[in-house]
Amino acid sequence: MKHTLSVLVQDEAGVLSRISGLFARRGFNIASLAVGPAEQIGVSRITMVVQGDNRTIEQLTKQLYKLVNILNVQDVTNIPSVERELMLIKIQVNSQNRIEALEIVKIFRANVVDIAEDLIIVEVTGDPGKIVAIEQLLTKFGIIEIARTGKISLVRTSKINTEYLKDKVVAYNA
């Protein structure tokens, strides 16, 4: 099972290197990684997605706490949270299919950030499922390049699960 870990660290040189070294020694692959400043000055948030069962992730968490500069480790996999990714995707278009490509972009509430006669660069943000879905639909146009961030995540203050919210929005709009 994939787990999303949110790790708060002191923003100092070598922290990410020590974390990646721990993962390498244990034979873990980091499927997704995003690092950036947290809400507190001098603290960074690392959001990573790793594969493993609950016991393995618990052991990994204990090992992370043993590293210098680790302030907090939280497995947010089963906690209601907001998850987002960003993808830039450059696709091949022509006069016959440009409108269809732009309609897909519009449906996904994505943005065209660059356009040329035969190429479009699209920026899309959303949960990982949305990113995968638009990528699959745009594949038929010919993908030239993709740049995709790792997943970022914050625990919901409301503690309400996203799936619950989707059901309520659908019922409300019906």
From Swiss-Prot:
EC number(s) given by UniProt: 2.2.1.6
GO biological-process terms attached to the record: isoleucine biosynthetic process; L-valine biosynthetic process
CDD domains per UniProt: ACT_AHAS (cd04878)
Acyltransferase among keywords: no
GO cellular component: chloroplast; cytosol
InterPro entries given in the database record: Acetalactate_synth_ssu (IPR004789), Acetolactate_synth/TF_NikR_C (IPR027271), Acetolactate_synth_ssu_C (IPR019455), ACT-like_dom_sf (IPR045865), ACT_dom (IPR002912), AHAS_ACT (IPR039557), AHAS_small-like_ACT (IPR054480)
Enzyme class: transferase
UniProt keyword terms in alphabetical order: Amino-acid biosynthesis, Branched-chain amino acid biosynthesis, Chloroplast, Plastid, Transferase
Catalytic activity: 2 pyruvate + H(+) = (2S)-2-acetolactate + CO2
Subcellular location: Plastid, Chloroplast
Pathway membership: Amino-acid biosynthesis; L-isoleucine biosynthesis; L-isoleucine from 2-oxobutanoate: step 1/4; Amino-acid biosynthesis; L-valine biosynthesis; L-valine from pyruvate: step 1/4
GO MF entry, a single one: acetolactate synthase regulator activity
ACT domain boundaries: 4-78
Pfam families on file: ACT_AHAS_ss (PF22629), ALS_ss_C (PF10369)
Family statement: Belongs to the acetolactate synthase small subunit family.
PANTHER family associated with the record: ACETOLACTATE SYNTHASE SMALL SUBUNIT (PTHR30239), ACETOLACTATE SYNTHASE SMALL SUBUNIT 1, CHLOROPLASTIC (PTHR30239:SF0)
Subunit structure, interactors included: Dimer of large and small chains.
Name the record gives this protein: Acetolactate synthase small subunit
Organism: Porphyra purpurea (Red seaweed)
